Design a protein with these regions (language model features):
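Basic, Lys/Arg-enriched alpha-helical interface segments
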Residues: 1-88, 96-101, 107-162
Length: 162
């Protein structure tokens, strides 16, 4: 079981989290232009698609509700990782630098996948942003991924009335 730690933030940290953020996304070496989160969405039930997009958009703009943001702490591999959560949705991410965060992936929490999914997320590659050029490329891919995710949600989400 993963321990979730309530974040006790300093005023400065709180202010930083409310600033606009930029996202990059974990990919694989085999396909460095396809973000893992897009593939992860295949295993997320359609009724949670809006939640995934809303959590991410609120995070970017610094408007997440209390309790939606948690640090992960129980496992050495997960040190430094955080999650956005609402209902069963978990979006795992890591702060890279300044206002840049790496989204590792998304899953829906179930009793039988808890540890496995956190381990999977912890083992994913964090993109190389050691140079300005690499960082800019990742930020560009991040914008493309956000558009792909938005389009995916628009097409596949479950409508409230049928």
């Amino acid at each position: 079981i993963i321990d979730e730690e309530d974040i006790t933030l300093t005023d400065e940290e709180e202010k930083k989290l409310q600033e606009e953020k930029r996202l990059i996304f974990s990919t694989s070496l085999a396909n460095p232009t396809k973000a893992k989160i897009i593939g992860d969405m295949d295993s997320v039930p359609y009724e949670y698609y809006d939640t995934v997009l809303e959590l991410i958009n609120n995070f970017i703009s610094g408007k997440n509700a209390s309790g939606e943001l948690k640090r992960l702490k129980s496992n050495k591999k997960l040190v430094g990782f955080m999650e956005l959560k609402y209902d069963q949705v978990r979006i795992v991410f890591k702060h890279i630098k300044n206002n840049i965060y790496n989204v590792v992936g998304v899953f829906t929490k179930k009793a039988n996948n808890d540890m496995t999914m956190y381990q999977t997320m912890a083992n994913r590659m964090i993109p190389d942003v050691t140079t300005e050029e690499k960082l800019n490329k990742q930020l560009e891919l991040g914008e493309i991924t956000l558009k792909q995710l938005t389009d995916l949600v628009e097409v596949k989400r479950r409508k409230g009335t049928r």
